[in-house]
From Swiss-Prot:
NCBIfam families linked: PRK00132.1
Family (UniProt): Belongs to the universal ribosomal protein uS9 family.
Protein name, per record: Small ribosomal subunit protein uS9
Region (Disordered): 1-26, 135-173
GO cellular component labels: cytoplasm; small ribosomal subunit
One Gene Ontology term from the biological process aspect of the record: translation
Top-level lineage group: Bacteria
Compositionally biased tracts (Polar residues): 1-15
Keyword field: Ribonucleoprotein, Ribosomal protein
GO molecular function: RNA binding; structural constituent of ribosome
Biased composition (Basic residues): 154-173
Length: 173
């Protein structure tokens, strides 16, 4: 460890860029997306964290290697989301990435309604999985559309209208 960084650079060998390297560097796969479970290597299991948003809801998510336990605002998944549809929405990223039951989830969710919170948690989990191991999980999550923030929000009410677009009844005479 007595070598300085400049001495290490002087000892390295420089190889020219060949046509064979160009083919590898610019190769495009005919099928770049990978379906769930089709990745070349198993997904890496490591801790990760991310934030997800949907409508007015914000979810701060931490995933830790474990046995698949859920803590959402201090409650279990079944207690926080009693509706099976919401439970399925929330667990979908793990199934898509092929790591069901490999992580414990700790989440703080605030704002919005139940469906918005489920969507925010789903996005947060997908982003956390992507942060942990992008090579294994990103293609499947991206293909399923789970890494995209749903930008749809409620439209504001306009002056002179009853709601965002509903106008008062119009009388011709």
């Amino acid at each position: 460890m007595t070598d300085t960084p400049t001495e290490n650079l002087e000892n390295t060998e420089v190889t020219p860029f060949t046509e064979g390297d160009r083919e590898i560097a610019y190769r495009t796969d005919s099928n770049p997306t990978v379906a769930a479970g089709d990745s070349k290597r198993p997904a890496m299991i490591a801790p990760g964290a991310a934030t997800g948003r949907r409508k007015e809801a914000i979810a701060r998510v931490r995933i830790i290697p474990g046995s698949g336990q859920w803590k959402i605002n201090g409650r279990t998944l079944e207690d926080y989301f009693p509706n099976k549809v919401h439970q399925q929405i929330v667990t979908e990223p793990f199934a898509t990435a092929g790591v069901e039951g490999a992580y414990d989830v700790i989440a703080r969710i605030g704002g919005g309604g139940v469906t918005g919170q489920a969507g925010a948690l789903r996005l947060g989990i997908a982003r956390a999985l992507n942060n942990v191991d992008p090579e294994a999980s990103r293609p499947a999550l991206k293909k399923a559309g789970m890494l995209t923030r749903d930008a749809r929000v409620k439209e504001r009410k306009k002056a002179g209208l009853k709601k965002a677009r509903k106008a008062p009844q119009y009388s011709k005479r």
